[in-house]
Amino acid sequence: MQSNPGLFMFLIFMLAPTLGWTQDHLPLANAATAARIRVNDPQETQTYFGDSQPETASDTRYATIDEATGPFVPPEPGTASLDPIVQPLPEYTDLSSSEEARFASPFSNDSSQFDIGLNLYSAPPFAGGLIVFGPNVAMKIGGFVKADFIYDFNPIDSTDSFVTTSIPVDAPPRTNSRFHARQSRLSFDTRWLSDDRVVRIYVEGDFFSEDDQFRLRQAFGEVGSLLVGRTWTTFTDVAAAPATLDFEGSVSNVNRRQAQARWTQMIFHEDLKLALAVEDTRFIIDAPTGITGEARNPSPDFVGHLRLDRERAQIQVASLFRVVGFQPTGQPVITRSAWGLNFTGVYLVTETTKVYSQILFGEGIGSYRDLPDAAPTAVDQGGLLPMFGWMIGATHNWNESLSSNFTYAQNDLGTTAFQNPNDVDQTTYLSANLIWSPLERVKVGVEYLYGTRKNVNGAMGDAHRLQASFIFDLP
């Protein structure tokens, strides 16, 4: 994996004006010195800045910066030392719950009663931890290191995630071991107040790309009801996503992130939310044999969902509509209308147990699961493929440090008589795990995975996998 030190410096210089830092405040004079910042404890009700005086000299509930090679010493009131520059600290900032609420974004789902067990889908909560403050602005730096140790008992071509469509049929027996840390993640959540409104920028990336290069997962701006940028599609429901250690997840879950412009609005009462979005589109077609051409996207994806939130339950109905096309070489574009519906639900059985479910169906939506949207229906014709998927699962906290998740899902893609007989017809996915948190922000887990693949001609293959993961969360 190649390092990119310029990326960090670029982010610092881009964010410095937003955070109210000027050239006088940037410690550039001494490259040999490094900054050490004491992270605020979210349990504390106050953080001391400016002229506020700690109760004792040993009280370290405030930020300070000193030389990395020197002792951690309290600064003079109102200053922090970074030889040879003396920096003024920001104005007094209260990190109590009221401060967290001050920067709360109305539709960003910072916290949820459904966050039971492992949650690698949502942004880190904007409270405590590694937060940088400036005048009327705050930035949370989040992320984690995740190391995966994988052993496959059967052939599967996707060694880093459990993609059941990559299970070969009638392959000779083989086993495989794989260690990687590609799911490790880094995020920057910046918020400020403008005319009594919270403006938010969120950028997130990981290393799950070719050659382990840093890649973009999410990048969006949000103010009030408007969100613009790349994030989870409006067609999905993060609250109903399975808590798996496996990166891929269930075969029916819509785990797709794409560029979009979304408007979210409460209707009738605060428990009912309507979201409407125009999103980027992708069309995958298996063209008839002997016909050359290109897939076309005449329209974006028009997506919406209606979500009902209650104290112990959440129900969401999502829909999408789009126009897709194929242009044979030298001929006009042939278009079809594709659609889909996604029903999801989450229910808190107890304070430590939740169950979730999903039903997904439509025509021409296979690409939302990296499958074909259309296939040949005759020698020189094609049509949209129907798809039907479903999932059930449960997550349980055994105690404060031990949790488990169970998920089973199935996805069926329609077939035609003119398809390649080795194309995918049906996939299934089963996951069961046990996750232990021996220390704060440290998790160790083991997960069993089983999947099947059935082809159009009826041939089947299956795979068993065992995965162990170590996760270290940023504060």
What is the meaning of each model-derived region?
Residues 1-8:
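Bacterial N-terminal signal peptides that target proteins for export
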Residues 9-18:
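Bacterial N-terminal signal peptides
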Residues 20-153:
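N-terminal periplasmic/intermembrane-space "pro-region" immediately following the signal or transit peptide
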Residues 130-161, 169-284, 296-299, 303-314, ...:
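Outer membrane beta-barrel
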Residues 150-152, 193, 206-210, 235-237, ...:
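Sequence/structural signature of outer-membrane beta-barrel proteins
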Residues 308-424:
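Detector for outer-membrane/organellar transmembrane beta-barrel domains
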Residues 436-438, 461-475:
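Outer-membrane beta-barrel "beta-signal"
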